[in-house]
Amino acid sequence: MGAAASIQTTVNTLSERISSKLEQEANASAQTKCDIEIGNFYIRQNHGCNITVKNMCSADADAQLDAVLSAATETYSGLTPEQKAYVPAMFTAALNIQTSVNTVVRDFENYVKQTCNSSAVVDNKLKIQNVIIDECYGAPGSPTNLEFINTGSSKGNCAIKALMQLTTKATTQIAPRQVAGTGVQFYMIVIGVIILAALFMYYAKRMLFTSTNDKIKLILANKENVHWTTYMDTFFRTSPMIIATTDIQN
């Protein structure tokens, strides 16, 4: 994605669209009793992310799956070309999917339908389920706020988790780069200040500090009558350089 701020914007947009699609296409509601509750949400490496859980439950698991995919497709379509360019690498890192900008929607849909319709997911009858995410990074100076929408079914939550893995992978791809970039900028500024300070001291010394010979010359210049030998002594205080040492033969 283009910037860390855009990650938060995209996450917010995605959450709003998922809630809206679940309500419209799966008759989900925040007031509906959920067959599955989220017990705990674990982030193995949390570097500044906040997670909240929102219930939008219904009895139609297939409609939930379609609603989540529809929300993801619309959100991806609204990204800028620069943001879309990041997405294939995130799919590979988060879900081990080899994809491209042009096929990412279809590949994600296939992944979700295959994974979330598997018997391991469908036959999961646990009433309280835990969600585990590998890692998440907050933007420099501010946390990244994520929302996990509980659909009340294993299939729906499977699709939600796949999207959550992608969004958290986006934070791990971008936030550390910005932190590193900030560090480089800081050191460049420090080096620049040191160079400018050295130049200032050099010219200040040339302008403000006078050598002993120059001081004598200034004093003599201010006197009215000075014998010519004094000038000679002042201007030739330093011994002349020896140009040649070979004896001259007559």
Curated annotation (Swiss-Prot):
Location of the protein in the cell: Virion membrane
Any one biological process term the GO annotation gives: symbiont entry into host cell
Induction data: Expressed in the late phase of the viral replicative cycle.
Main location class: virion
Disulphide bridges, residue numbers: C34-C57, C49-C136, C116-C158
Keyword Oxidoreductase belongs to the record: no
Transmembrane segments: 184-204
Membrane topology: Single-pass membrane protein
Record keywords, A-Z: Disulfide bond, Host-virus interaction, Late protein, Lipoprotein, Membrane, Myristate, Transmembrane, Transmembrane helix, Viral attachment to host cell, Viral envelope protein, Viral penetration into host cytoplasm, Virion, Virus entry into host cell
Parts of the chain on the Virion surface side: 2-183
UniProt PTM: Myristoylated.
Record keyword Iron present: no
Lipidation, N-myristoyl glycine type: G2
Intravirion face residues: 205-250
GO cellular component: membrane; viral envelope; virion membrane
Stored InterPro entries: Virion_mem_poxvirus_L1 (IPR003472)
Pfam family, one: L1R_F9L
Record note on quaternary structure: Component of the entry fusion complex (EFC) composed of OPG053, OPG076, OPG086, OPG094, OPG095, OPG099, OPG107, OPG143, OPG104, OPG147 and OPG155. Except for OPG095 and OPG053, each of the EFC proteins is required for assembly or stability of the complex.
Family of the protein in this entry: Belongs to the orthopoxvirus OPG095 family.
Function: Component of the entry fusion complex (EFC), which consists of 11 proteins. During cell infection, this complex mediates entry of the virion core into the host cytoplasm by a two-step mechanism consisting of lipid mixing of the viral and cellular membranes and subsequent pore formation.
Name of protein: Entry-fusion complex associated protein OPG095
Record organism: Monkeypox virus
